Amino acid sequence: MQDSIEQYMQAVGQQARKASRVLSSASTHTKNNALSAIYTALVNHEPEILAANAVDMQKGRDSHLDSALLDRLELTPTRFKGMLQGLKDVIALTDPIGEITDLAYRPSGIQLGKMRVPLGVIGMIYESRPNVTLEAASLALKSGNAIILRGGSEALQSNKAIATAIQHGLKVAGLPEHAIQVIETADRAAVGQLITMTEYVDVIVPRGGKSLIERISNEARIPVIKHLDGNCHVFIDVEADLHKALPIALNAKTHRYGVCNAMETLLVHEEIAEEFLPRIAELYAEKHVELRGCQETRRILGSSVKTATEEDWYTEYLAPILAIKVVEHIDQAIEHINKYGSHHTDAIVTENYSKVRKFLAEVDSSSVMINASTRFADGFEYGLGAEIGISTDKIHARGPVGLEGLTSQKWIVFGDGQIRH
Amino acid sequence: MQDSIEQYMQAVGQQARKASRVLSSASTHTKNNALSAIYTALVNHEPEILAANAVDMQKGRDSHLDSALLDRLELTPTRFKGMLQGLKDVIALTDPIGEITDLAYRPSGIQLGKMRVPLGVIGMIYESRPNVTLEAASLALKSGNAIILRGGSEALQSNKAIATAIQHGLKVAGLPEHAIQVIETADRAAVGQLITMTEYVDVIVPRGGKSLIERISNEARIPVIKHLDGNCHVFIDVEADLHKALPIALNAKTHRYGVCNAMETLLVHEEIAEEFLPRIAELYAEKHVELRGCQETRRILGSSVKTATEEDWYTEYLAPILAIKVVEHIDQAIEHINKYGSHHTDAIVTENYSKVRKFLAEVDSSSVMINASTRFADGFEYGLGAEIGISTDKIHARGPVGLEGLTSQKWIVFGDGQIRH
């Protein structure tokens, strides 16, 4: 079995590599044609796709998947419409491939510039949500990359049905069918193969729980664009405008709980804590947010607030729970963020110019915000179109990753016969 | 021993991480001050450094190091001057850190942009040449990164002497001495530690032979900016201007042999081969370049030309040897380059507009050149100032890597109290 999985994955890899060569020089027109044909095929195949999803859902219920997972797995007609809209958005995006920038003459007489090119073959590993299949496939196609998709086994029928529509679209546009491949085995060995086929795969994008991503990062022999966790902070400075601070602190925590850009720890300057904390606590109480505070927070808000432990500062709750710490000054806030945070998204609320500059320069996170809710850190809000993930790495892509994160730049040189002396 | 190496390296890593936090927000003025102080210290320490190098050289001769290695190891007064000039060049470079680009308003009212930041801690692994110690240290410092340097054991005394001058310079400028650390053990286990300390090191830059780099890439748990090999091509199209083609083909092969951007295979369009090959062969003969040709090449040039085997197409000779293949058309040339090449640097010589566009779009190499010698692919010629390496990867940095390759961009958001709806 192990052998046959290896053979299967090697074949998938070879086909992807071959298809990627065609895709890399496909015109914008051809790629958009394929995406439009996929759109039409999806509309035509909607009943089959929803039926396949119903099979996955029934199997999921039979095997007692937890309700959050079942929720993510489900494709309703509304979600299906959302998927189609996402696809339309990708068609509307500017094709990044072939863009030439920075063309300038060097003293030798050569003219040097950079040209944007696809990475090649993307390996995508994800859990449950079948809409990721379409999102990832369309972003890969638009950016001239081939993609190998490995969704969760619980979504296999849904993903296969979506893949059928995608294949149909590729065929209509005359692009190789292996440009987008869905792994059709539930065997976990397939993932082990995918993340080590260095000759066939150029980058791995995992999406899912922290344990999945950690496992993949540890075992991959291929660069991984990974998103570990989002332990985000908002720091309310003594010079904060409370008309901004209160809505931001409320929005960053309560707009949605289960998302990576939600605030998990609130930091408050000690000279504003007496005024700010009781007012924000009242707003959190209305939303039933559980507060866990440092000693000073509990002195101000009362001992009904639980004590935050060292562990709390590290925790991404993804729930209506918030840790609160009173700090002496901005340096302590920055130190806390850089030490306990996950380098995802952190914000300061202040009117002070020099503190803005300090916070921007010293907070080591993929998004650093001034007087705005951390909830803005996402591909749509950043105008990237669809988002293939949010990277907490520093190498290659950082923060929300859209089309450009799936590309690279090569150097180009225009000469007139120059030789090196 | 293994334990103590681990403890030693962990301490080195922790200190580097700590120093990197200071460096990341050091001003351009402070960093340049430190570099100038290092310059002065090097000038003052020249006798000690050359004496230390003499010790390494003697030891090298005693242990029968080969002459190429001894040559790379040697620090002559002329080479020392070259090192100092390189340092001056780095001081003159624009500081990339803190650069803010693409600031634009989003529909939500937030203003979004990107800010250039250091990667953090660089691990540099290299062989013999002690000037790399200064080059890498100065580039890291200028770009706000801490660096851990692990040179070859044969250069240990030279590297320690250079490091002493560097430490002195850091001290004068008030920067942490651990910003630049030289590993002082010859134990190979130190490398194993360095490339797996994911919490303390952000990127590994290996420089050396292919086997060293392959070993490091395979074992590293940290992203590697690697340069495997340079199997470069020049394709002489039927529409080539021979006044350009002859000098380029000669220069790309014979300007220097032991460099990664030298041409290793010459591809010639069949309709120009009869005219071009005898003329270029004459020029190569003057330089005593050994030719290995395909069947058609040997038909034209005579059977004194050796037969090129499949193996030859893959080979980076780094020597006065050249493989030659006659191809039917540009597609065959591109296919050959993408299949056998190392995606380093490849050139076409042609006057045809559409072939230029095709070659640029379809050749998958870090540098793609039109009517210019492949020898131009280097950090100095590209105006990057010093070069920390040439990357044959697509992720993060591609081609010659200078200061910018040691940086990353974070997103920054300026708001006025915006929350997400």
From Swiss-Prot, chains A, B:
Compartment annotation: Cytoplasm
Keywords: Amino-acid biosynthesis, Cytoplasm, NADP, Oxidoreductase, Proline biosynthesis
SUPFAM superfamilies in the record: ALDH-like (SSF53720)
EC number annotated for this UniProt entry: 1.2.1.41
Gene3D superfamilies: Aldehyde Dehydrogenase, Chain A, domain 1 (3.40.605.10), Aldehyde Dehydrogenase, Chain A, domain 2 (3.40.309.10)
Pfam families, per the entry: Aldedh
Chief site of localization: cytoplasm
CDD domains reported for this sequence: ALDH_F18-19_ProA-GPR (cd07079)
Molecular-function GO term, any one: NADP binding
Reactions performed catalytically: L-glutamate 5-semialdehyde + phosphate + NADP(+) = L-glutamyl 5-phosphate + NADPH + H(+)
InterPro entries: Ald_DH/histidinol_DH, Ald_DH_C, Ald_DH_N, Aldehyde_DH_dom, G-glutamylP_reductase_CS, Glu-5-SA_DH, GPR_dom
A Gene Ontology BP annotation from the UniProt entry: L-proline biosynthetic process
GO cellular component: cytoplasm
PROSITE patterns in the record: PROA
Top-level class of the enzyme under EC nomenclature: oxidoreductase
Pathway the protein acts in: Amino-acid biosynthesis; L-proline biosynthesis; L-glutamate 5-semialdehyde from L-glutamate: step 2/2
Family affiliation: Belongs to the gamma-glutamyl phosphate reductase family.
Function: Catalyzes the NADPH-dependent reduction of L-glutamate 5-phosphate into L-glutamate 5-semialdehyde and phosphate. The product spontaneously undergoes cyclization to form 1-pyrroline-5-carboxylate.
Protein name in UniProt: Gamma-glutamyl phosphate reductase
Gene that this polypeptide is encoded by: proA
